[in-house]
Amino acid sequence: MPSVFIKTFGCQMNVRDSEQVLQDFIERGYQIASSEKWADIILINTCSVRAMAEEKAIDKLASLKTAKKKNPNLVLGIIGCMAQNRGREIAEKYRFVDLVLGTQKFHKVAEIADNLLKNPDRSSSYVDLSKEEAAHNAINKHLSTKAQPIAYVSIMQGCSMHCSFCIVPTTRGEERSRPIDEIFEEVKRLAETSVKEIVLLGQIVNRYGAKEFPWVKGKSPFVQLLEKLSTIEEIKRIRFTSPHPLGFKEDLIAALRDIPQLCEHVHLPVQSGSDKILKAMRRGYSRSKFLSLVDKLRKAIPQLALSTDIIVGYPGETEEDFQQTCSLLNEVRFDNAFIFRYSAREGTTAASLGDQLSEEVKFERNYRLLEIQNKITMEKAQKWVGQVVEILVEGESKKNASKFQGRTRTNHLVIIPKNERWRGEFLPVRIVETTGHTFYGTPLISGIDEALQFDLQEEINPAPIVS
């Protein structure tokens, strides 16, 4: 039986795309290799949002040249965002690559790679970066090899916002949304398995259907979708990522308040606290409008947890601009923040701007902002210690397989002792300790000692929120 291995870089949408590709291979009689060493086909699903992500993928590709020499019949492919953006360059420079497919070809990866494996006489790379009508509708399969309580559902592809720093409209194309009924049927199928929570995915997820579907009775297509999915009884939690502040109209705020399945967590990317930088980024809102939105959300959902994305070192960012971002963090007090150093992306407006900041300045500002946020994160996390929360137990902790992990409705990660009876179940847990980014808890169920403690030192320290 032939085998396939996929190394995935980047966001959750890339992970979801890889899942689709793997399931297509399974349906063709392949098995998923546990390591690239055992694979007949090796694919790298790539990311282009920052230079570091591309560098990691290129390094991985270069490291596989030896494997290709040892086994010329090995099929080696590059797929995803970097393939879309730099595919022909990659095929020309790395001639040992057999396959380069863009972001609108995920549904064809298995077929093409399988044909290449059956044809060892390959004279050149197979490259296809073309657009394909309705390709966004094809990301609808989930791995049949393992049951999970949480499933990610792609509801749209692409982005039409064209922020000045962002390469996504180039790599993913303009936004295209799947029909509500198709998404509903996909989630119904998931609900018939072990899935209890779904996470809806889109580059700008709350712009779902903006071009394709009408508002009905004052409700956007996205809210219509949320309401329909909430009727599936087995689905107890619904999340979505990643939204844009401009997409939070009154109907969505009301839905967050009124639909019980919608979790009390919103990821709200602000990117900067400076009006000058926000305008240069083409974000479409001011600092004051963002703060007003935060106020509306918190008034509607008092238990709401907020996370955000921030870019430091955008071209032309002065110390005063940076201080405005620092003050915004202190004013909003996000539960978590993902802080990134600006990375110039060729072809974007920001990459051609003057006054590009040095890497030294970017690193220094990144560090200072991270210090502020880490302090806020710890202060907010400490307030949860001693409280009882409900978690959905996902399975083994990513940092320590001898423990289980789960998440609260507010998206806080909780580590608990491992017990197979709890896998995939909702569990009441008392929070006994926190590192800020991670909570540690004691399950509160019949026959379990509430005072049960376990060695926190066994856990590997959680990764910092900056990447």
UniProtKB/Swiss-Prot annotation:
Its cofactor is [4Fe-4S] cluster. Disulfide bonds: none annotated. CDD domains: Radical_SAM (cd01335). Monomer. It comes from the Bacteria. HAMAP family: tRNA_metthiotr_MiaB (MF_01864). GO terms for molecular function: 4 iron, 4 sulfur cluster binding; metal ion binding; N6-isopentenyladenosine methylthiotransferase activity. PANTHER family: CDK5 REGULATORY SUBUNIT-ASSOCIATED PROTEIN 1, MITOCHONDRIAL TRNA METHYLTHIOTRANSFERASE CDK5RAP1. Transmembrane segments: none annotated. The gene is miaB. This is tRNA-2-methylthio-N(6)-dimethylallyladenosine synthase. NCBIfam families: miaB-methiolase (TIGR01574), MiaB/RimO family radical SAM methylthiotransferase (TIGR00089). Catalyzes the methylthiolation of N6-(dimethylallyl)adenosine (i(6)A), leading to the formation of 2-methylthio-N6-(dimethylallyl)adenosine (ms(2)i(6)A) at position 37 in tRNAs that read codons beginning with uridine. Pfam families: Radical_SAM (PF04055), TRAM (PF01938), UPF0004 (PF00919). Residues 145-379 form the Radical SAM core domain. Binds 2 [4Fe-4S] clusters. One cluster is coordinated with 3 cysteines and an exchangeable S-adenosyl-L-methionine. Residues 382-445 form the TRAM domain. [4Fe-4S] cluster 2 binds at C159, C163, C166.
